[in-house]
């Protein structure tokens, strides 16, 4: 039995699964099988019986369409992925979806498919490994020591995100990040030389990567020597450029775009079996090949060795060991609830008129000392986003730091933070202007899809940004985030709601939270202790006239002040007015029906929503009989205090809308 036989097991399973599903991508798994065989059998440190072992190597398949490569590897090495699951490739409720998805399949470290983002996740994983090692490793006690390996294709390197993240990886000198470039020269449209003629080696050398120039990706010895060389380079990430043939083994489709994204066809699969010397029926793997691939015994020994290291570490450094375990398990500090609630109550008792971006920074200063797991950063807007707090230390200055200067890389930043979140041991936060979530949008969506624990700080949230004008003024962005499944948003109206938003964002384990913050100063509102508690429910009654409301005014963020002014005017007319603060629509929507009804009673149809964002979103709360004071187009370049009245954000306009809803004559 040869190494080719072991690699051919991957090729056969990949061909068979794609053929049975009548859907999928056989070419890349067949082309990268030899590389994967060497990496997984000779180098990868992992334990199939415990896929979450803290010190395992991380393997990322950035070209996620090649998912059958990964599923074949997981099945062959002994993960809980039986053959039946491979037969159900791309079928409903299988553990083998079309693209790898974290949480579905044991051993899958991240969800990949949108090209280039797996590479970004890998950079995040490598950052997390190095930072965690610097924070916890002690002389003679190295408990964090693993590599991050990432497979990528031509498409990954064409995507702009690859530039963002590989540039940063080189700047940070991530020596334990090793990339494998599947240079097969084929994409969906055909031979890439018509649209991708970059000198990839020079490109990555310019990023300060160690580049191992083109090796034969079908020569196991060349692959092995390249990996050994890459592992020996400690101060730079490494890229191994592997010349491969897409659809390797297919007599008529190898090296052609026909092998990329469609089944080979039964006749071609049979011919490929003959050419590869694989004389076994579909989905049949000989016992001796299973035995050669089985990584369970080796993995259990590796983990047991680490367990012994950790036991010695725990004996020598009990407090560090306890903290390491807490952070890797995602737990919160012991005094978290008591300390955060005390801070929130103190804010309410000491009113301040400040921007919510400043309130966010103040909250970081209050919560940060309790949370060494915070690993923050901004896309070159730290002085504006106010994401640097008194305990921030740049990773560039200190490997054990807690702050990343991401540069102008919004997309890369967000996807890197997803990788940091997946690694464990950290709660990443990222920041930019709300408008520039547009650059980061797909990574933000992926965070929600993957249930990544990332906090996104988006400041300058509206026309309140002012003079920079409509290119920088967010209008539809918040509504877009609110409409994203499993994406939590907070638009606080003052420092108290901002502190509650940060608290719940840190506590959320199953998805991202965006904090939508103002540039301009906002007045603090009065609250009772019960109202302070109800902020955490996403929406609550902030002001009430008593009795059944004649009209309900709903507001968020910077528009709360004028809404309260409008309520005073309406109350002066003898009307019962209720003001509802709705900083988090998703959290409010998740409350029980009784609570939601107590805040927004269904028998009160007269409602006006006020928010300096796109108006359409608010019809779900005001109904077709209600009114909205919101944006219906883009902003303008002018001082903020001129823009708000120009676009109708005044107490007088809210009153006028209320009159119309109430049917006041002449309104």
Curated annotation (Swiss-Prot):
Quick one: a GO biological-process term for this protein? pentose-phosphate shunt
Q: How is the cofactor bound?
A: Binds 1 Mg(2+) ion per subunit. Can also utilize other divalent metal cations, such as Ca(2+), Mn(2+) and Co(2+).
Recorded family membership: Belongs to the transketolase family.
- Record flagged with keyword Cell membrane: no
Check the record and name the InterPro entries matching this protein.
Answer: THDP-binding, Transketo_C/PFOR_II, Transketolase-like_C_2, Transketolase-like_Pyr-bd, Transketolase_bac-like, Transketolase_BS, Transketolase_CS, Transketolase_fam
Q: Where is this site: Important for catalytic activity?
A: 25, 260
Listed binding positions for thiamine diphosphate are 65, 113-115, 155, 184, 260, 436
Kind of enzyme, top EC level?
Answer: transferase
**What gene, per UniProt, encodes this protein?**
tktB
Q: How does it assemble?
A: Homodimer.
- Per the UniProt record, which EC number(s) apply here? 2.2.1.1
Q: Where is the active site?
A: 410
Q: Which cofactor does it need?
A: Mg(2+); Ca(2+); Mn(2+); Co(2+)
Q: Reaction(s) catalyzed by this protein?
A: D-sedoheptulose 7-phosphate + D-glyceraldehyde 3-phosphate = aldehydo-D-ribose 5-phosphate + D-xylulose 5-phosphate
Report keywords, A-Z. Answer: Acetylation, Calcium, Magnesium, Metal-binding, Thiamine pyrophosphate, Transferase
Gene3D superfamilies in the record: 3.40.50.920, 3.40.50.970
Protein name per Swiss-Prot or TrEMBL: Transketolase 2
The source's domain of life comes to Bacteria
Q: Where does Mg(2+) bind?
A: 154, 184, 186
Q: Which residues carry this modification: N6-acetyllysine?
A: 342
List the source organism.
Answer: Escherichia coli (strain K12)
The coiled-coil segments of this chain are none
Q: Which residues bind substrate?
A: 25, 260, 357, 384, 460, 468, 519
Per the record, its GO cellular-component terms are: cytosol
Q: Name one GO molecular function term.
A: transketolase activity
**Task performed by this protein:** Catalyzes the reversible transfer of a two-carbon ketol group from sedoheptulose-7-phosphate to glyceraldehyde-3-phosphate, producing xylulose-5-phosphate and ribose-5-phosphate. Catalyzes the transfer of a two-carbon ketol group from a ketose donor to an aldose acceptor, via a covalent intermediate with the cofactor thiamine pyrophosphate.
